[in-house]
Swiss-Prot record:
<keyword id="KW-0560">Oxidoreductase</keyword>
<keyword id="KW-0547">Nucleotide-binding</keyword>
<feature type="binding site">
    <location>
        <position position="185"/>
    </location>
    <ligand>
        <name>D-glyceraldehyde 3-phosphate</name>
    </ligand>
</feature>
<dbReference type="InterPro" id="IPR020831">
    <property type="entry name" value="GlycerAld/Erythrose_P_DH"/>
</dbReference>
<feature type="binding site">
    <location>
        <begin position="13"/>
        <end position="14"/>
    </location>
    <ligand>
        <name>NAD(+)</name>
    </ligand>
</feature>
<dbReference type="Pfam" id="PF00044">
    <property type="entry name" value="Gp_dh_N"/>
</dbReference>
<feature type="binding site">
    <location>
        <begin position="154"/>
        <end position="156"/>
    </location>
    <ligand>
        <name>D-glyceraldehyde 3-phosphate</name>
    </ligand>
</feature>
<feature type="binding site">
    <location>
        <position position="79"/>
    </location>
    <ligand>
        <name>NAD(+)</name>
    </ligand>
</feature>
<dbReference type="InterPro" id="IPR006424">
    <property type="entry name" value="Glyceraldehyde-3-P_DH_1"/>
</dbReference>
<comment type="similarity">
    <text>Belongs to the glyceraldehyde-3-phosphate dehydrogenase family.</text>
</comment>
<feature type="site" description="Activates thiol group during catalysis">
    <location>
        <position position="182"/>
    </location>
</feature>
<dbReference type="Pfam" id="PF02800">
    <property type="entry name" value="Gp_dh_C"/>
</dbReference>
<feature type="binding site">
    <location>
        <position position="121"/>
    </location>
    <ligand>
        <name>NAD(+)</name>
    </ligand>
</feature>
<dbReference type="InterPro" id="IPR020828">
    <property type="entry name" value="GlycerAld_3-P_DH_NAD(P)-bd"/>
</dbReference>
<dbReference type="GO" id="GO:0006006">
    <property type="term" value="P:glucose metabolic process"/>
</dbReference>
<comment type="subunit">
    <text>Homotetramer.</text>
</comment>
<keyword id="KW-0520">NAD</keyword>
Amino acid sequence: MAKLKVGINGFGRIGRLVLRAGINNPNIEFVGINDLVPPDNLAYLLKYDSTHGRLRSQVETKDDGIVIDGHFIPCVSVRNPAELPWGKLGADYVVESTGLFTDSEGASKHLQAGARRVIISAPTKDPDRVRTLLVGVNHDLFDPSKDLIVSNASCTTNCLAPIAKVINDNFGLTEGLMTTVHAMTATQPTVDGPSKKDWRGGRGAAQNIIPSSTGAAKAVALVLPELKGKLTGMAFRVPTPDVSVVDLTFKTAKATSYKEICAAMKQASEGSLAGILGYTDEEVVSTDFQGDTHSSIFDAGAGIELNSNFFKVVAWYDNEWGYSNRVVDLMLSMVQKEQLAAV
């Protein structure tokens, strides 16, 4: 397999962690970074991370880029993606991680700039034109002839979808309500301030448990159409830096038991969803999952059963690191299918 050449647009939390997740992969070469922040600051933020620790690579700065273990990655600062030098840099795929260009029109500017494909590291605002693909759930639907732009959805959808898939495949999921207890993110202020769309979201992140909306549960239907109209959810933002947890309360079509649900999750975690869905029956807490690469880790000791058709299950996820690893996995699965189609 020829090396996949990747550009990153937006070197924030996810952009940097995608690079960390892929930098030592022999099948990936990062060829460019676009961010309005100067290269020396980008290199500093890549090297030192308060949550995930120091990068175990040598990181240096040049005027026009950063050097990681001797490999030079050019950095540019261009506001309009259509003007980026992806063609000149040889970028095959671009990870769109600014959070700004999440529809077809915005993301397609990277194609105009010379990239072959775009992976949006966020839910798309244009689901009818941009396919949502989740590794382990529906990534095999990638069509090299049509899918020039794809979305990797959100970290929460990546956590919920494998759980929902196992439940639905084995017992039938008739309806469900999800709550994600979600770590702080960069959109939240450190102290109280105005927030135009969501007043509660403007309150100090480190001081409060903040109820919030999320489209993550409904978005599961984009990758599991059979669950359309059966799931919705909400979020609580909590004062922790990383690792979140999904709580799904649901009804099943088939009468079953919590023990049988746990058995189905364990089987999937060791089989069809190995590496995507994890399983634990230990007495764990959130920090135990920091640095975990799974999309979702089912917690057998945390779920409950009301009756043979009504249950609650709990699944953990490192909302930064797990998600960033899925972006890398998605790119590699896409290019592999692309190369097979070309033979």
